[in-house]
Amino acid sequence: MFNVRQLIATTLLLSCAFAAQAERLKDIASISGVRSNQLIGYGLVVGLNGTGDQTTQTPFTLQTFNNMLSQFGIKVPAGSGNVQLKNVAAVSVHADLPPFAKPGQVVDITVSSIGNSKSLRGGSLLMTPLKGIDGNVYAIAQGNLVVGGFDAQGRDGSKITVNVPSAGRIPGGASVERAVPSGFNQGNTLTLNLNRPDFTTAKRIVDKVNDLLGPGVAQAVHGGSVRVSAPMDPSQRVDYLSILENLEIDPGQAVAKVIINSRTGTIVIGQNVKVSPAVTHGSLTVTITEDPIVSQPGAFSNGQTAVVPRSRVNAEQEAKPMFKFGPGTTLDEIVRAVNQVGAAPGNLMAILEALKHRPLQADLIVI
């Protein structure tokens, strides 16, 4: 049914006519079932320079340490539960197991302190099994940590901390022990899931694949998925997908969005965001000053000294210019106009909040 050589020749001919704005199919969609899996584990980091957990406050660290020693035939004497270990820290370990990972391959891991360790710098992670959501062990982690931050403290109590010393990474620190079953080679169809569901993009993918391979090869399931017929032979399926994923697709225009972060003042504006005719915004500053006074009773009186609150409330309306825009004005033009008069990001966010109720022709997302 599928001739790989003919597909390659046809793809090369069609690629010359693709627009410069087009994107590869692999950049806008993923194959259903081809995904990474999260792994997590719990272990110990040893060899710390006195920056480990205070085990009197984190009993689980000491319990884990004792369990590890018991596996080597070492029994901790009774009554030593309050021993202080300064060079050991309990940590969580997590990693992403990439698709098609096989036993013997290595993956990067992230190690994070879960106790009160001050720093993991200089530590080594002991053998830690990494489990999936199904409870099976898929990898074994061990190795020396690479920590980007550090912590220093003087005798007078002054201290300095750079970045985050309580977390680190081990490149290639986990060895894969079990492969995750994949349904990639099952069935005679494959499903392409769009990273950003869009009906226009889904239709253009269907049209592009059918123009290349023939009618009915690709069918849109909905705005987020496209189902394509595929060879049954695994090697042909790989060649087939290598051609499909390099097809140039012109994606549909995304929905106009404005994203604002009220905590940081960050504003992200999408393309072609337009507003209706007029906008005006003023700046009102309300100042409340607390100036309590002390009421002192006279001598030999039965009165008591009391604090009497006294507040002054002052409202100031700054003389800000009125902004007026014509129909079809883009939000980018509004931002430039607001910035020219020296308005703060908070004023711009207030304008965007007001525009949300009617004139703003876009989705306003506040994070």
UniProtKB/Swiss-Prot annotation:
HAMAP family registered for this protein in UniProt: FlgI
Protein name as it appears in the record: Flagellar P-ring protein
Cellular component GO terms, alphabetical: bacterial-type flagellum basal body, distal rod, P ring; outer membrane-bounded periplasmic space
Described purpose of this protein according to its UniProt entry: Assembles around the rod to form the L-ring and probably protects the motor/basal body from shearing forces during rotation.
Organism encoding this protein: Pseudomonas putida (Arthrobacter siderocapsulatus)
Predominant cellular place of this UniProt entry's protein: periplasm
Family affiliation: Belongs to the FlgI family.
GO MF entry, a single one: structural molecule activity
Signal peptide: 1-22
Gene symbol of the encoding locus: flgI
Lineage top rank: taxon: Bacteria
GO biological-process terms attached to the record: bacterial-type flagellum-dependent cell motility
Keywords (A to Z) from UniProt: Bacterial flagellum, Periplasm, Signal
Subunit relationships: The basal body constitutes a major portion of the flagellar organelle and consists of four rings (L,P,S, and M) mounted on a central rod.
Pfam families: FlgI
Compartments where located: Periplasm; Bacterial flagellum basal body
